[in-house]
Regions:
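Sequence context of c-type cytochrome heme-c attachment sites
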Residues: 389-566, 584-599
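Intrinsically disordered, glycine-rich low-complexity segments
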Residues: 7-14, 22, 26
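N-terminal Sec signal peptide cleavage junction
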Residues: 50-52
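Bacterial N-terminal signal peptides that target proteins for export
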Residues: 20, 25-37
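A short C-terminal boundary segment appended to hydrolase-like catalytic domains
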Residues: 79-81, 347-431
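Acidic, metal/ion-coordinating pockets
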Residues: 54-371
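Bacterial N-terminal signal peptides
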Residues: 36-46
């Protein structure tokens, strides 16, 4: 993950990390760790999510830089862009950074603040989004719809003109999404997918028939949109790529839609674009700048750029969550192919500067949405001045009022599946203290023991996150599992991150502590009963090393210890993942909560 100058302190408390292991002799390894020097090869293990062992030092929050340069460093200084296009996509329902650690990137509050900063320069600004607004997965489907609706209203507040239609949007049952926003709002941002048609019982029907409810003047999903931005007429076209369209049809992700095809029954996006370009030529505003929102790969986008050089900008899907710093130029040099990554951590900005003869000089800037773009002032001031924050607060209130926390579907925990005869249930950490008194006291002093309180007391912009299943799942015990957390009032013993968050439902072990099979079940990271983490002393020494040396040193650990470290880290990263804790490192975190082992 890229590192930018950004303040680290404050925010929520850093959550520690639970686990259970036992001591192992590794004296030779410990001596080797003391002696290790030099540079090694980075290994692709799961020990850190970001490639660094600790957050950057605390510094004043400054404007982000890319490649060591300030934003827009190579843009003309003597004139403003005739139009500025802010580009986002593949947001996947991401509203705000969770705040569990800092710094983090992205969020609608920061994006809105950034857009305001461009407008404050006097630049004409318009926003476009590739699509995939709906989350990739949600514990409660209704909450996914709320996120979609909230993001669409946020884009409207920021001045977006158009949004493409992506795979997650189609998987979410398209009509429910249309009902949540497009049916209610006959104004930008408009949904665009030029090759989309309807289908009833295998019979193809027109776009107008499939997506034109009575009373509205345009299809809920249209082919293109044209608007005046400043003095420039901008045309936006949406298109679902051939590969994705075939996947949608082959997997029957949405049986009520199909795509424009040729006489041989093949998806024919070329014919679609030819027809669309003709329609744009005949449009009263005669667009001067054309942008294609293309739900396909960069390779497919390059072919379209070759065949349709009329588009100055093509926005395509990002396979990786981190976007490339620079766009790709088509072979003829007339088209920028842009990718902006996932979850709104970054936006792309295209500035169009007119040249003689009617052509454009295009400049591009990738912008990381760092804490620099947090709305300034108190929370109350930010709520008044940032157009998105009231929407986020309303969203949080709706999640609470609809009691979505208790709507989470419960599934069997893996150990409940393996041993249905034992009727294993969650007990609560307080039940562990009789036999594990020292470990319980250590847990009680850790941040894990009040994780849900932290969510309630410190989460803000919006608050009320202790009612949000997507947050509570990592601040409670067993929310998604049978007999797990339901709510603070109904299951108070399962509040916070407790012993069973990692060890699994403990009723069987508590009632029969000598049962060897149950003991092994309580340590799911063990491949073999004898597997152990390195000694605490070794873990601390590894934590003190720079990352490259740390990676080199861990190769001297016994294979069973390396395997255990990796399996434990992968369990921790279910919550301490790249989004929520980009500086997670097991060697650094484990000593904070080391238990079940000798020093």
């Amino acid at each position: 993950m890229k590192r930018f100058s950004e303040e680290r302190g404050g925010g929520w408390e850093q959550h520690d990390l639970p686990n259970g292991g036992r001591a192992s002799g590794a004296g030779s390894v410990e001596l080797w760790v003391q002696r290790v020097v030099g540079v090694g090869i980075l290994l692709g293990s799961l020990l850190t999510a970001s490639g660094v062992t600790a957050p950057p030092p605390k510094e004043p929050v400054s404007e982000p830089r890319i490649g060591g340069l300030p934003l827009f460093a190579d843009w003309p200084k003597d004139r403003r862009p005739a139009v500025t296009v802010v580009i986002s996509g593949q947001t996947y329902g991401f509203l705000q950074p969770c705040g569990c650690t800092r710094p983090q990137l992205g969020g609608l509050e920061r994006r809105a603040q950034f857009v305001q900063s461009l407008k404050a320069k006097g630049w004409p600004v318009v926003g476009v989004d590739l699509g995939d607004i709906y989350p990739q997965q949600m514990y409660v489907r209704q909450q996914g719809l709320l996120r979609y609706e909230t993001i669409m209203h946020a884009l409207q507040a920021m001045g977006y003109l158009a949004v493409g239609v992506g795979k997650t949007d189609i998987e979410a049952e398209l009509d429910k999404l249309l009902t949540a926003y497009a049916l209610q709002e006959e104004r930008p941002p408009y949904l665009l997918a030029a090759n989309l048609l309807g289908q009833v019982d295998g019979k193809v029907i027109s776009r107008q028939e499939r997506f034109q409810p009575a009373g509205l003047n345009r299809p809920l999903i249209d082919r293109f949109e044209v608007a005046k931005v400043g003095e420039v007429s901008v045309g936006i076209v949406g298109l679902i790529g051939r590969s994705l369209a075939e996947e949608i049809e082959n997997n029957k992700l949405e049986p009520s839609i199909t795509f424009v095809k040729n006489a041989q029954g093949k998806i024919d996006n070329g014919a679609v674009l030819q027809e669309v370009l003709l329609g744009l030529e005949q449009h009263p505003l005669r667009p001067q700048l054309l942008i294609l929102l293309y739900q396909g790969s960069a390779e497919e986008a390059a072919l379209l750029a070759r065949d349709f050089p009329q588009f100055q900008v093509i926005v395509c899907r990002s396979e990786e969550s981190e976007p490339p710093q620079f766009p790709t130029r088509s072979k003829n040099g007339s088209t920028l192919i842009v990718q902006v990554g996932h979850k709104g951590r970054y936006v792309g900005v295209v500035g169009a500067f007119p040249q003689r003869g009617g052509s454009w000089q295009l400049h591009y800037q990738l912008v990381p949405l760092t804490e620099y773009y947090l709305a300034p002032g108190s929370d109350a001031e930010a709520l008044r001045n940032n157009p998105v924050l009231p929407l986020l607060q309303t969203y949080a209130e709706r999640v609470r009022d609809r009691n979505l926390l208790e709507a989470v579907s419960k599934r069997p925990h893996p150990v409940q599946i393996q041993h249905p005869d034992l009727n294993l249930t969650y007990y609560g950490s307080h039940r562990c203290q009789n036999c594990h008194a020292a470990d319980y006291l250590l847990w009680a002093k850790s941040a894990h023991s009040h994780a849900l309180d932290t969510l309630e007391q410190k989460a803000r912009r919006p608050n009320l996150r202790h009612f949000d299943p997507e947050c509570v799942i990592c601040h409670s015990v067993g929310l998604e599992y049978q007999s797990g957390f339901v709510s603070a009032s109904k299951t108070p013993a399962l509040k916070h991150v407790g012993c069973e968050s990692c060890h699994g439902p403990g009723s069987g072990h508590a009632t029969n502590p000598q049962h060897a099979g149950l003991q092994l079940l309580m340590s799911p990271w063990k491949q073999e009963a004898a597997d152990r983490l390195p000694s605490l002393e070794t873990m601390k020494k590894l934590a003190s090393l720079p990352l490259v040396e740390q990676r080199q040193a861990e190769q001297a650990l016994p294979i069973s210890q390396r395997r255990t470290v990796e399996r434990v880290a992968s369990m921790c990263m279910k919550c301490h993942d790249h989004d929520n804790d980009p500086y997670f490192n097991l060697y650094v975190y484990w000593p904070k909560i080391a238990h079940g082992m000798k020093p």
